[in-house]
Amino acid sequence: MNGTNLIKIAVRALANNKLRGFLTMLGIIIGVASVITMLAIGQGSKRSIQAQISEMGSNMIMIHPGADVRGGVRQDASAMETLKLQDYEDIVDETRFVSAVSPSVNSSGQAIYGANNAPTTVYGISPDYLEIRRYKVEDGDMFTEQDIQTAAKVCVVGKTVVDNLFPDGSNPVGKVIRFQKLPFRIVGVLESKGYNSMGMDQDDLILAPYTTIQKKILAITHLQGITCSALKEEYTDQAID
């Protein structure tokens, strides 16, 4: 049976049962439309995720100490003391594919101002962290390298921290808040970034000199991490090597 005869038989079958033919065609149309819609949604989601990753820093590299295994039990990587300040300095001096580097230590606790308090996380970093994570200071200034050298008790805060501690809308710059009983003078407020694709509030944070957090809150000399930014996204692999 050739193709022409098959087409004739199919046409006669559809003509004899127009309702079935209509439903068959409708099913095909709906199926094709569904596939096109899902592809469009997939492309839209892909673009949205790519945009959010780019906002976080698509060329960002995070270095953490490897977790040790003792007695068959994997230890908490954050407790490892193998990552030193010298490692950070070596990256700054020797890596030609990296544009910005920041040490990283952090601690969670209550931030307090007057009668207001809220749980948050303080990140001990260097000013390069803003470039790496694409944060901008909206009001006031970023703390300086001099503040790092002196382990100054200064900080820059996110909008969520401002809303929680200053619900009356007063300007927080110049005010002194407390974190784990340690006073910090606010020198700047970050521009809002909102929530990321994982549902994390990128404005619920305090940034302070890493030396201050190391010495006066954590009482450690090692680093919990190093965050870098490759010169270009395509240089990320070379920077890691």
Give residue spans per PLM region.
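N-terminal Sec/SRP start-transfer signal
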Residues: 1-30
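Mid-to-C-terminal secondary-structure elements
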Residues: 128-143, 152-240
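Hydrophobic, regular-secondary-structure patches
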Residues: 43-121, 125-131, 163-164, 214-215, ...
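Amphipathic alpha-helical segments that mediate coupling or scaffolding at interfaces
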Residues: 10-13, 28, 44, 48, ...
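Short, strongly hydrophobic transmembrane alpha-helices
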Residues: 19-47
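Short, glycine-/polar-rich solvent-exposed loops and beta-turns at beta-strand/coil boundaries
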Residues: 55, 147-149
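Conserved amphipathic alpha-helical interaction elements at protein-protein interfaces in regulatory
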Residues: 13-16, 20, 51, 55, ...
